[in-house]
Amino acid sequence: MKRTFASILLCAAGLCSALDAGAAGPQKDSVKTTFQSSREWRPTIDNRADAVMVYGVGGNPSDKNRKGFTFEERVKSWRDRGYITHFMTGIAWGEYQDYFTGKWDGKWHLDEGQVTVKGDTIWHGHMVPYIVPSENYLKYMKEQHVKRVIDAGINSIFMEEPEFWARAGYSEAFKREWKEYYGFDWRPQHESPENTYLANKLKYYLYYRALNEVFTYAKEYGKSKGMDIKCYVPTHSLVNYSQWQIVSPEASLASLPCVDGYIAQVWTGTSREPNYFNGKAAERVFETAYLEYGSMESMTAPTGRKMFFLTDPIEDWPRDWVDYKHNYEATFTAQLLYPNIADYEIMPWPERIYEGLYKVSPDSDKKDRIPRHYSTQMQVMVNTLNFMPESSNKVTGTKGISILMSNSLMFQRFPTHQGYDDPQLSNFYGQALPLLKRGVPVKTAHIENLGFKEALANTEVLLMSYSNMKPLDPVAHEHLAAWVKKGGVILYSGRDNDPFQTVQEWWNTGDNHYEAASDHLFGLMGIPAGAEEGEYKYGKGTVYIMRADPKEYVLTAGGDKKFLDTVCRLYSEKAKAGKVEFKNSFYLERGPYDIVAVMNESVSDAPYTVTGTLIDLFDPQLPVLKSKDITPGYCGYFMDLDRVKKDGPKVLAASNRTYDEEVSKNSYSYVSKSPVHTTGISRVLLPARPSSVLVNGTEVFDAGNWDNDSMTYLLTYENNPDGVSVKFVW
């Protein structure tokens, strides 16, 4: 092993000079919208994003009824339709049977799967194990996959989901990696917290190494062919991986020179994972999605890496179209509440969305393809992402309250020890949901990023706990102490009696003899080890210690009162940042768009009223409204025509994408494209009431479709991926 685990984390914190040169960030590409598909182009899935990530040299392991298209043929089919073509595949699993069965190098490699304590391999699909990424496997990935896609002219590579299951760690392949990494024999992770911590640090390192090696090779091989290869990591959020008990390198990758960016893989499937609030476990899709997207933004923002936000109109688990629609609106709204992110993966697997059969309602066994009203709404929504601006506007609510996170959140989830449990990641949600549910747009900050001055630049009060994570390097504490000394405020929650406090780590080895990791931080600020609950001054700042684990704030009804009272007092009296405002909604004005979320389980059941000259973008009929009430548990998405430049005719909202626009003194024409078997609907701004509306040369003008107040015409027709020609005359 050439680099220690601690050195990896130092680099992730912006403290490694070799990586700092890369941390300024490479040039971002021009792709704003993209999607992933393992299929060749076909008219039913032609969603008209800027780019497509063609999935897998051999496709997706779950593909059925393949038609035998080669990778190169699939790429060509999309290029012929005007798409920029990129490549995506899994780094932890994939269509790699030629490796597992020995076709590649003459040796079977099924023993390199991730294995549980019972000796069972963890499978992603038939003959598709989750992998312990050995050096031999990485050689295979470079030679058989990366080289081939670059030879096909692909210049952007997405290696998704670097995942090592927390319950794995018992295979012979893992034992070999353990011996090489630590220099001593493997130890079963279930036998002690120490072993669990060691095992999970190794899992973290193995996929850090894997992506570093594969991406470095991709860039070097591309350079030899005169190509500038971009490399991205599509990954779940730290919130989700921690909750699902998966270990992944996450934040440390952002500072690697070979990593150009990420896709934040957040969707209904991740965000509906139940969590606790006010003593009740429940799905809270909007709130969880908001925290997931936030953790991805804060993880990369200081590094300048490109970030795509993903949403999915359905999910992996078969449910019904009513469920899919409601939760898609929630996750879609959550992503838009981050105005500094404006690049999107608009959907994964359009073949599954447009061609899959799902229940028409929760109380019906009938299955059908996506309803017309939902495909129309979905296409209107994703088409707006092609024009979504970044914005300096902020979400409504009290600013400056952040929750500290660490990659080590993933290290303490499984197995449990000494009876200490953290149900559904409640030590994290216990700091987040009491505020978020009351309309406070809490942010997250990553301990690995504290070396970047931007990490805490907008934080007034930092909430932290070591009950569910540990600092992986003492340097982070130096940054925190310096921040407090200059006037920062920390609210530390923790009994510091979880079993991972005693693992052999930097705070209790060598010259350090601290019983709890927090005692090292406290010592830097003149606070005694094991300090009692209370308030402590350091420099211009304040530390308040609450001797309760954050899970206690949400596992029982009303358990968050003292926590909330303390946060509010620290914010107003110590940070002197004003009064913490409680409400049941979030609102953001983003260019011409209004984004609204109204929460249940909050401070009131009052609706949020949006006013203006509004196109309702969640309504497939695109009505123009003067106001609309959004009730708790629902979201709203609107274009306000009062904020649209009236500088000529234009398509304002549509379920198709517009090309070849031409404007003359008394006419406006264009070509629209979208998948077959879907409804085309457009609300078009015009300088005057039209006298003629032509669709493919046929007159379709209907006076009832003209709205004089908004000066817009509502046009509908059948979509066509080959193009529909439209012309307005006035």
Language-model-detected regions and their locations in the chain:
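Helical hinge/lid and interdomain linker segments adjacent to catalytic or ligand-binding clefts
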Residues: 46-47, 422-508, 603-604
